[in-house]
Every structure is written in structure tokens, then in C-alpha cells.
Amino acid sequence: MNISNYDADVLHDIYGIDMSDIDGLGVGAGWGRVKAGTSSDAHQHDETETFVIVAGSGVLIVDGKQYPAVPGTVIQFEAFESHVVRNTGSEDLLFATFYWRDEHRAAARVAQPAARRRFGDRPTFVFSTPPTPNGDLHLGHLSGPYLGADVFVRFQRLNGAEAWHLTGSDDYQSYVVECARRDGRTPKQTAEHYSREIAETLRLMDISIDQYTVTDADDTYSEGLRDFFTRVVDSGSVQLKDGPALFDPESGRYLYEVDVTGTCPTCGSGAGGNICEECGEPNNCADLLAPSVRGSSAAPRLGTSRRYNLPLHSFAADVREHHRAGKVPVRLRELANRLFQRSELDISMSHPSEWGVPPRQDGVSDQVIWVWPEMAYGFLHGIQSLGRDMGRTWSAAAPEQDWKIVHFFGYDNSFYHSILYPVLYGLAYPEWAPDIDYNVNEFLLLEGSKFSTSRRHAIWGKDILTPDSVDAVRYYLALNRSETERTNFSAADFDSVLNDTLIGSWQESVSYTHLTLPTNREV
């Protein structure tokens, strides 16, 4: 006989679980404890493992799906099956675990296509950041989120996963207002025009979009956004608060994002309002060094504005917990670590503006929901719209635990996607633990300097994409994609790859093979 009793004094940490060994059973065995209000790390291993829950309550998250864990629950994990133990109760969650290596079962699991192993039968929603309709797409845009997401979706489908590519146009950006002023149009006209141009350029790039959401043209979007924002406000964490703000010294106009430039208070690089593209850290405009009104040498006036505010510094543990569950590149984790070293990190959720969706709440009649928090809802709305067209019952108001979300975006969007949005989802839907993978790209340079829509320093998609050239462009951008560091698009290098590799090597090889194959008459 072999009797083992649980002893809390001999526990040690493994994968975020307090563990102790049970010896002499012929298989690996032990006791496990997850304390109230905590979760284990997301982990997987080559053993088959069985849990028997003996006390407490919680959930088991297995490859993104959530299952209840109460006394009497027995669950077996196959080799390499990712799992998380989350204690949702007020007492310790205790379980006995038994594990062993079964080479045949492990081999069968590994033999499954990678997408099936990771995503199973779950719906997989792959988002490329909705572009701002203040201009068409250039090769810098196309090489980043859009080509990346397109290739990823194609690969998942080849491996049997149910995956879709979703994007749209980010109509309510302040950059649309500035573009409209410059072009002599209304913001609505500007967004409509460039949204159509963007969709056409994606088509020319042979990028198939399963759901393209045009936020200003969607009749159900505004009310859904207001519902989402109301949920966030009703959580009690987002409240109206007076804070420092910048104003035009002559007109008194409130300045944010596109309206103001200066020096990043964190890294010292040139930055626009609210975000630094270099270090990825947010600013509140008023903390920019040497700020100036865009298009003017005038220094803005410092004042105060009452806006909806999120004390993001209060959610460091929530963000770290979220990052433990999915694919999060090291650079995004480093960004989160830097930001949460700040004692205060207040983020405005609304701004005075005439362009955008006003919140439903009283007291901010001159304000709109800031477009970046808005985008957190926009992704869920895209899933709902896709589902409606497919006859599926997906709802932005009730996100489902088995949804797998995969984001593709440039590093300048990292703060919003990987830090702000998980917090907003937690406030709006506290019972939902979103399973999100993040794929970030660095900037593609053009002849050594940044592509820029606003400065018109770019090679526009429509200027290079034709039915004859699209494969060569896709190949070169994939070959030269800035996945971990900045890369450069050089016209001379593109011509060299086209003429020497694609035509001089590949095409000649195909032509030679065709000429030397025996004809039917010779066989």
C-alpha cells in the first residue's frame, strides 16, 4: 500500500502551480495547488497528464477552450496540449496529477497539422490593423500587417484550420480630419474615398479580406460601440477626470494626435500626440517636450480638460496574466514592463472632437470616444459582422471563450493592441479570458527613410501592382519583411531580385524543364 497526504509545507513552484511529488505509484504523480484569484502559466509538455480535482473551484483552459473545474472533475491532457488552471473561487484549488510518457499518443498528436494542434476546431479570427483612410496603401503598409495576415490565413487553411482575415477602415482617426482640411473635403467624404481606394489596393495585392468593416458606413457600429463603452464605464474603473491638455494659442482648439508634435518625454525622439512611434510609449500631449502646433511654429497653450480616464497603472497584473496565455513577442513584454514601472499611467478614453462617436454618458457632449479604445470594440464588431454573413451567431456583446484571435500590426500600434485592449476587454467582459496571439512588425524603410502617407514619401500599391507584377512584389516583400528589425526597400535591389532570381533563375529553370520534358509522341 502507498498512501500520500497533501502537505502545504512542501510545495514548490512549477508552471505557476504549487506542487509536491507523490512517489512510488509507477507513474509521475503529485499534488497541485492554485491559490484563490490566481492562475497557472500556460504550459504544455510531452507527457500525457490527468488531473483529479479534490477541492476548490475554478476553470481549466485547454487550447483556449474553458471548462469548469470542481471537486470530482477528472480531465486528461494529451501531449503538447496547452493548458491553464485558473482559480475563480475564494479557497485554494487542489488537485492530484498523474503523468506519463506514451510515445504512440505523443506521435499521433505531433502528426496533426500544426494549425490543428494549436487551434483545433476553434474559429480563428486574424486581424490586420484597420488602416487610416487618410491616403492609399503604400508598400510599407502592405509588407507589414496585411501581407503577414494574408500569408498566415492561407497557411492555417492549408493545415485544416477555420481561419478568416478581417480588417477595415479606421474612419474616425484625427488624421482623417487633417487630410480633409488639406484636400478641401469633409472628414466623411475623405474616409469614404480612401476606404474604397484601400480596399481596391488590397485586391490588387491579391490579399483576400473576409470581413472589411467601414466604421462610419456601418449602421449598427455606433450603437454597438456605445454599448461597449458603457460597459467599460460601468465597471467603475473609467471615470471623468480633469487632466492637463494642450490648446491652440489663437483659436483655443483642443489639440491631440495629429494636431501636435514634439519630443517624446521617454526616449527623446520626435513624436506626435499620444504615441511615440520609436519607443512605442504613449504620451498625454501635455508631457511632450517642446511641443508645437502642427503646421505652425507656435507653442500650444497648456490648460486642463475633463475627459474619461483609465488609470492603466492599476492593471499591471492583469496585463501580465494575459501575456502568459498567448503568443507575445519579447519586445511587447518589454514595452509592458517599462510602462508599468511608472507610478501613474492615465490614458484618456475620450477627446473633444466633432469627428467620431460620442459616448452615451452625460457631461461630455463635445467629446467622442477616442478611436484607439474604439478599435477594441471594432474587432469584436468585425467578428459579429462576419458571423452574420455566414449564418453564425457570434456577437460582439458576448465574446466566446473558444474564439482564437490573432493580431498583425506595426510596432507603433503595440501599446494599444497588447496592453490597452486586454484591459478594456477585462472591464467590459470580466468573465471572458481572450486568447490572443500578437504578431508585430518593424518599419519597412524606403531608400533608407520611413514610408509616410502624410509626407507622401512612398511607393503606392497602385503604382506598382499589376496582374503581371503582383507575384514578384509579394515575393520581394515577403523576402524582405521587417519581422524582427527594420528592413529597407531599394528599387535597385527589387530589380535585382526580379531579374536575377525570379526571371534569370526560376523562370529559366522552368522554361528549360518544359523544353526538355518528353512530348506525348516521344513517350
Model-assigned labels for residue ranges:
Residues 514, 519-523:
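Single conserved hydrophobic/aromatic residue that forms the stacking wall/gate
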Residues 112-160, 166-167, 223, 279, ...:
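Structured secondary-structure scaffolds
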Residues 1-28, 33, 41, 106-112:
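A short, N-terminal "cap"/entry segment at the start of jelly-roll beta-barrel domains
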Residues 42, 60-61, 77, 83-89:
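Short beta-strand His + acidic residue motifs that chelate non-heme Fe in jelly-roll/DSBH
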Residues 25-26, 86-116:
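Double-stranded beta-helix
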Residues 114-320:
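N-terminal, positively charged nucleic-acid-binding surface of large information/translation enzymes
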Residues 45-59:
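Short, conserved beta-strand element in jelly-roll/cupin
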Residues 65-78:
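Short acidic-glycine-tyrosine-enriched beta hairpin
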